[in-house]
Structures are given as structure tokens and as C-alpha cells.
Amino acid sequence: MTIMTSPAHRPPASSLSIPHEQAQSAALKGASLAFQKQLDASKKKASPPGPNHNNKLTTDPRGGALVAATSAASLSNQTTGGSSVADHHHGVPEHATLSSRLAQLQQRSGSPHLRPPGNAGGPRSASFIAATLAASRSTSPSPSRKNSVVTPQEQRRRAGAHSRASSVGSLRLTSPSNLGPSPGQGVDYGGYDGEDDADLDHDEDTGFRRLGRRKVVAETPTLPAREQSRRRDGDPVKSPSPVRDTEVPQPRRKVIDRVPEQEEPASPVQKPRPKPKPKPKPKPEKIIKTEPRAAPEPVESKRAEQYPGSEPTSPSIRRASVQQPKPKVARAQPARTPIKAYHSQKEIQVLSRILMPKDVDDIDCGPLTLDGAHGPPFRERVDSISSDDTFFSTSSGQGRRAPTPPPPRRIRSVRETPSRPHSEATTPSSQQRSTSSQSKQTPTSANRSSLALDSLTNAIVASSLASARHTPASRSQTPAPVPVPSRKRNDRLASNLTGGGMSRSHSRSPPKKQGMLTTLRAPHSKSDDEEARKHKERHRKRGPLGGKKHVHHEGSRRRWRDSVTAEERRRYEALWASNRGLLLPPKDGGVGQQHQQQQPEDLVANVVVRDLWSRSRLPHDELAEVWDLVDLGRRGSLSKEEFVVGMWLIDMRLRGRKIPPRVSQSVWDSVKGLRVPAPA
């Protein structure tokens, strides 16, 4: 029958912890007697080396004892693995597992012969278990233990220590590196170095001494039962060879189950492999502070990725790993201190990165003084090397203090915290650890972020208060820009209402009216016409002292001009020169007639005059009236003077004046000018 205890059939923790002292003393005495018997049997008959799955043979003369020890440990782990893992899961100590295992062995019906190790379903005798556990001592790699003669007293002491620690050692295999063979053996366990076996032996020795310091030595009534079972099994213990090959991967499952328990002790100093101190009493204070930081599930997954060879190979182990829940941390047991120091450094860096984002690193880390100015930045000061204990004291001490420190002190402590990742991130070892420990801090970020949020809030409030105290001084030094335009508006409104600021408003008005004036105008003429004079008066009356009373000048205006200005005459003569002689044939005659009559080259035809005058858009009757006034020769064409006077009359009509009934002589004289007769 297979003895597999599950959490449902496991006896309660109280019943297991009662016969603890009795079970340990029974294991001591039974193991010592069985070890003496096993030594006598090993001298007579040596077991042959067994084959290995890796096609390697064991050549060590201690191979028989080693195979027996490993087979017994494998069978013990296979049959009682459920109860041990379940005990750790429910928080039952390891001595309860030891007592429960011995109680189960006493209740079984012993058989006089040893079953083969492949058939783990039947009962086993107590002497076989004690002998095989005691024989595991022979796996030590030290040469002094190979060749030295063992006295009976040393045999009893070693057998008692191994009987107490082997059940614990089945669960407490600290890392996959401890599964390697001894230097004298040729068995390959998956590529691990053989020197790690010395660490396993060293850890077992330290575990034996700690268990021995508990002074749990008492007489037990179960000794006669164990001696009877030993007498019943009269045959010497033989170590079966093929069991090692099939059951070797079994302790690898226990490595994974044991890993979360190693996360408890924290040692700030990193050394290659230091021996644990005999009294680790002052360290559990820091361990209690850092307990919520350990997350068993991410560590287990991380260890599985880091050591791919630690995956179980047998089907029973795989089934147990799927069905069994992940164990919780039962108690703090300092073992493998370099691993924990490695883990604590990762915790420090990831905690600081989770609590303080990148924006906080960009902030100047100088302390905020009461003057509103930042002091020297702390980044230069934090570059000096500081221990990990200082970081734990600043982070965990905030939640432990009852009185709240003053705001500047808390600002300083908070600003030192984000600068910690800068000093640690410079080392290459911390950069390698940060990548593998990102998944550990997810459950602890909420606890730590509350403290950091409180500290950051106090820092922000203090900085805002300090800046608010000094803003009135800066405002008083610089004038406020808002009241200045309001005073200008008030002065402008008052000047418009009272009329006192006329000169100011008057000086600004001309650009507005000048913008509406036409720029394409003829230059100012010297004529005395009404419009030219009005144009002058319009610009003249806008002086610095204002306009005059009688702006229209009713009595001083002139009625009619009776002369053509020289400027107007030049403009009209240019138009005549460009259109003369058009559509007129030349005339032949005597010299006297040519002198008396105008030449056709100096005349402008009536059709051409009509076309030019019609561009003024005056009515045809008015244009006909002007034609009658200027056509003196009645020949159907106009000379130079006639054409100029006709153009002048049309312009006067366009300016608003009426066409006169006759043209005065002064107008004709202004047009003719000085004439020089042609030479004969």
C-alpha cells in the first residue's frame, strides 16, 4: 500500500507537536543501533555499482552507502512529500513533520524483509529508514571522513544528528546547486558542480547544531517497539543500486518548495559563501520589517526560469507539483546567506524605482529652505557609498515613528530616497539584478507607495507655502501691469467729457481723415478758381489753434474766371498735337492763301473733336453749344486756339459752372499768347 499523506488525511498540528521529544529520542537510539548493524554488513558485502540514466557508473567505494541513502531519501520524499509540503503550507513547523513521520512508521505493520526500492507501495521497517538516513553521512566529500576510523561514540552522535536532520534535510535543500555529486563520484545530476555538495554538507551540519542546541533530549517509551522492529528485521540492510537512477530528480522538487523559506533572512553584506553565524538572534528584527516584501510566487517562477534543470522528471513529481499549492513562509531560518543578500539588493533597487518615478529623479534633490531657494543638491552627496542598513532605516523607520518630524526634515528624507537609485544604478551588479526582480515588488508597492505619497505630499505643501510667503515681496518690487491701461482709459474719457484734451484728440484725428483722401490727384495749380481756393482753405483752417468762425468765406469768393491758366493750356495743347491733321486731306493754293488760311495739318476734324468731347459724358446739346461758341471759321474743323478754349469750357462745366453765352476776349487772349510771324 502507498503511504501518501494529503492535507485532508494529515493529523492536526497539535497532535503532531505533542510527542516531539519522544520521537526525536527514539530516532536517535534507533539510528545509532541501525548504523552499527549497517557498518558490519557493509564490511562483509559491498553492493555493486548501479547503472545511471546518464550512462555513467559510480566508481566510488562508498557507492553502496550513497545509493542506499539517496534511495531512502527519495522514497521518504515520495511517500511523505505531500504531508511535508502541506505542513509548510499550513504553517506547521518542521519538528511536527518529523514526529508525524515517526508516528506513521510505528503504526505500520513491519515486514521482515526489505522491499525493493522501485515498489514504494508496501510498508517499510524503522530500521531500514534509520539505517539509510544514517548512511547518508557517507556522502560527505571531506577526505578525513573517508579514511578516519569512527569510534562508537562518534557513530552515535552522527547517527543521532542525521536522524534528526534527514527528515528536515529532505525539505531543506537550499538550492539546485546542492544536488550535485561529491568530487569523488562520477554521477551527473544535470550539469551542476560537485563543490556545491560541500555546501549541502555544511548546511546539514549547521542544521544539526541548531537542532542540538534546543536540548530536546528525553527518554521515550517507543524504544522497545523500535528495538523489536530491528530484531524482526534480522537481515543486514542492502543498498539497491537501480533506485538512484529513477529517484534522483526527486529532491529537485523540494528545492522549489524550499525556496520561499530562504527569502526571510536578509544579510546586507554580500560575500561568496560565508558560514552562517551560530547565533543569528539580532537579525530577525530586520527580517520582520522586510517580511511583506517577499513574494513567494514570483520567486518560485524566477527560480524555475533561472535553473531549468530543476524541473521534475518523474510523473509522480509532476503530478504533485501541479496539485499542491504553493507553500507559505513558515519561519525564518538563515541559510544560504549569499542568495538572500543578492535578493535584498534587488529589493532595495526595485522598491526605490517603484516608489519614486522618473519625474522625481529629474527634480532637484536639494533641500527646500525657508528662503524659497534650494540648497546644494543631494546627488553629489549621495554618490558616497552608503550601506543597505541606512536605506532600510530611512524607509522602514518612517512607518515606525510615532511623532511626525518637522516638514523640512521629512522633505530631506524623501529627497534622499529617489537619489538612492542613482548611486546604486551605477554599479553593474545592481543593473543585472533589477531586470530579474521586477516581478517581486508588485504586492509591496501599495504598502510602500502610501508612505512615499505622504512624504511627497508634505514636500509639495511645504514648497508651495515657502513660495507663497515670498511672492508678495517680488510683487511689491515690480509694478502691476494691470492698472496702467485703466488709468489711460480714465484720462481719455475725462478729456473727452471736459474738452481739456482737445489738442491731444485733434492731433490724432488727421491720420484717420488722411487715410480716406485720394492720392492720385494733380499737383496744386496756381489758378484762382473756386475749387482750388477751397482746397487750400480746407487744409489751412486745420491749424494748431483750430478753425475760424466763418469757414465758408461767402463774401470773398470769385464769380467767374475769364482767362485760361498756362498749366491748363499746356495740357490742352498736348491733346491737340496728338490729334491734328487726322482725316483731313491736304489743300493746294497760292502762297497768299496759305498764309491767310490755316493749314490742314494744324486743324482737328469735327468727327475727332466729337469723339474726344463725348468722353466727358456731357449731354450732346451742351457739347453742341460749346461747338457753336468756339467754331469761328465755320469750316467743320477747329484750330489750335479753338480746340483749347472748347476743352476749357467743358472742364468748367464739369466743375459745376454753366456754359456762358459768349466767350470773353480775355479768354481768347490768354489762349493765343505771343505769336511770331514766319519769315518771308
From Swiss-Prot:
Biased segments, Polar residues type: 14-25, 97-110, 311-324
Ranges annotated as biased composition (Basic residues): 272-281, 535-560
GO biological process: lipid metabolic process
Entry-linked PROSITE patterns: EH (PS50031)
Xref: InterPro entries: EF-hand-dom_pair, EH_dom
GO cellular component labels: cytoplasm
CDD domains: EH
Disordered: annotated segments: 1-341, 361-451, 466-563
SUPFAM superfamilies xref list: EF-hand
Residues that span the membrane, as ranges: none
Pfam families found in the cross-reference section: EH
UniProt biased composition (Low complexity): 65-76, 130-145, 384-402, 426-445
The family this protein is said to belong to: Belongs to the IRS4 family.
Function description: Positive regulator of phosphatidylinositol 4,5-bisphosphate turnover and negatively regulates signaling through the cell integrity pathway. Involved in rDNA silencing.
UniProt name for this protein: Increased rDNA silencing protein 4
Native source organism of the sequence: Pyricularia oryzae (strain 70-15 / ATCC MYA-4617 / FGSC 8958) (Rice blast fungus)
Gene for this chain: IRS4
